Regions:
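A short, basic N-terminal segment
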Residues: 1-78, 254-259
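Pre-Walker A (pre-P-loop) alpha-helix and adjacent loop at the N terminus of AAA/AAA+ ATPase modules
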Residues: 69-97
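Short glycine-rich substrate-engagement loop in P-loop NTPases that contacts/grips substrate
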Residues: 74-80, 119-158, 174
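Walker A/P-loop nucleotide-binding motif
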Residues: 93-111
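P-loop NTPase Walker A phosphate-binding motif
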Residues: 109-123
Length: 259
């Protein structure tokens, strides 16, 4: 309690905006009349609140388009431009994004940058780690856990833009496929926008390709293998495919820091 009281005393009240006087509205003089519009201070405050509501992990605090390093790789530069243009044009284009590529190339960085750009435009967004979401849903089946599956999924079902990070990271099972289908189909039917990242490149499942024996075991798993062919097809109705391919982004910075 004492700590909280000290924090309250130490807080410095924000200065009143000299433009709007704290109302959040400012006058705009047109040629023939006078109008009011939202003040910049209100928009900044709104963006800050929406960013907090998006529940981004603190490890991504510094992730935006200006901090993404392409390292001179044309494919990464092209991916960055495509994603940033999409974020700038939203909501003119409400089709989502599917960012696929090898681990460590900065897919989540770019997806988070897009999410932040949308909050600056007043869009309600939510970050979801695919593995954490499935784990929380599984835990909700425990009688000692108060949150129900529906309560956990409601924000995922209702938020205008959801970033589903690392799709396919959990070993596939009927339950996993059913849960992924529920999430994606619900958002699809509600015409909500979804940004997805995955380390698994696009491709049909092994069962669809009818691969057997050594050929099947040597083949790299695809997105179709991890989420099921039906949901892979649904993704392409919901999202623009963006291939993010290049040198390991995280390894590059670890190497730079060791020099």
């Amino acid at each position: 309690m004492q700590k909280n009281m000290t924090a309250l005393r130490d807080e410095t009240p924000e200065p009143v905006c000299p433009i709007c006087g704290g109302t959040g509205w400012k006058d705009v003089l047109a040629e023939t009349d006078r109008r009011v519009t939202r003040c910049d201070c209100f928009l900044r405050s709104q963006a800050k609140h929406l960013l907090e509501m998006a529940d981004l992990p603190s490890r991504y605090d510094a992730c935006d388009f200006s901090t993404y390093q392409t390292g001179g790789t044309d494919a990464l530069a092209a991916a960055k431009i495509k994603i940033e243009n999409w974020a700038d044009q939203y909501p003119l284009d409400r089709t989502g994004l599917l960012l696929v590529g090898p681990s460590g190339v900065g897919k989540t960085h770019l997806a988070v940058a897009a999410l932040k750009r949308l909050t600056e435009k007043g869009i309600h967004c939510l970050f979801c780690d695919y593995r954490d979401l499935l784990k929380q849903i599984q835990n909700s089946y425990n009688a000692s856990v108060q949150a129900t599956e529906l309560e956990l999924l409601r924000p995922v079902f209702e938020t205008e833009v959801v970033l589903l990070d690392d799709l396919g990271a959990v070993k596939p099972s009927e339950w996993v496929w059913d849960t992924v289908s529920l999430v994606l189909n619900t958002r699809y039917n509600k015409k909500l926008t979804t940004i997805i990242t995955s380390n698994f490149l696009d491709g049909p499942s092994a069962s669809l390709e009818r691969l057997e024996g050594p050929r099947r075991s040597m083949r790299e798993e695809t997105l179709g293998d991890r989420i099921g062919e039906r949901m892979r097809s649904r993704l392409f109705e919901m999202c623009h495919l963006v291939l993010v391919n290049g040198r390991d982004y995280r390894q590059k910075f670890r190497s730079a820091g060791s020099r």
